[in-house]
A protein has these predicted regions:
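Hydrophobic transmembrane alpha-helices
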Residues: 1-53
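Juxtamembrane/transmembrane-helix boundary motifs in multi-pass membrane proteins
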Residues: 2, 6, 28, 32, ...
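Hydrophobic alpha-helical transmembrane segments
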Residues: 8-13, 38-42, 52-58, 83-88, ...
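Short helix-perturbing small/polar motifs within transmembrane alpha-helices
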Residues: 13, 20, 77-125
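Alpha-helical membrane-inserting segments
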Residues: 17, 21, 25, 43, ...
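Interfacial aromatic-anchored transmembrane helix boundaries in multi-pass membrane proteins
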Residues: 22-33, 58-93
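Membrane-embedded alpha-helical hairpins and interfacial helices in multi-pass inner-membrane proteins
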Residues: 108-174
Length: 174
């Protein structure tokens, strides 16, 4: 069991890593390929459900209060951006990954991979409806799914693979 101070430091570290991951990006229309999903997976895997979700909540809150840590800055204006739901989705994503890590009984690689896939589904379950409604229904649901999800899945699969490989080496060691 980790000390509360160690948990707080690791939580702050993963909030910072998620912020850094926002700037390691390839712009693509309304969104970008970033490393935020990777760091959210790692937060859930290594910190567990509560501290992992807290790290992502801190990241989102710091961006909303104006720190320029989102891909296009920060501030309350992000509520109106089509991609804001994906930022919110990082919180339940980390929580679900951490919870599954506690309860699944597979070998570490498989447990991490499955947990991250389910967490990614949660991210898209929050992000896609927000994306659709923020665009005012101007896009069809099909175009929203393609542009807000399907084009990112190969890259997300790669991030989950790397998180599973790295996480299986680090799990239980932090």
């Amino acid at each position: 069991m980790r000390s509360p101070l160690r948990n707080m430091l690791l939580t702050a570290l993963f909030a910072a890593l998620t912020a850094v991951g926002a700037f390691l990006r390839i712009p693509l229309g309304y969104s970008s390929f970033t490393l935020q999903v990777f760091f959210t997976c790692m937060a859930g895997v290594l910190l567990g459900p509560y501290w992992g979700a807290t790290s992502q909540a801190i990241y989102v809150l710091l961006g909303l209060v104006g720190l320029p840590i989102f891909t296009e800055g920060g501030g309350l204006m992000y509520f109106a951006k089509p991609t804001f739901g994906f930022l919110l989705g990082l919180i339940p994503m980390a929580f679900i990954i951490g919870m599954l890590m506690k309860h699944l009984r597979f070998k570490p690689f498989a447990r991490i991979a499955l947990s991250c896939v389910v967490g990614l589904v949660a991210l898209y379950a929050v992000g896609l409806p927000c994306f659709y409604f923020a665009l005012g229904g101007a896009w069809s649901i099909g175009k929203t799914i393609v542009s807000g999800c399907l084009i990112f899945l190969p890259y997300d699969a790669l991030k989950i693979l790397v998180a599973s490989l790295l996480g299986s080496k680090l799990y239980g060691r932090l």
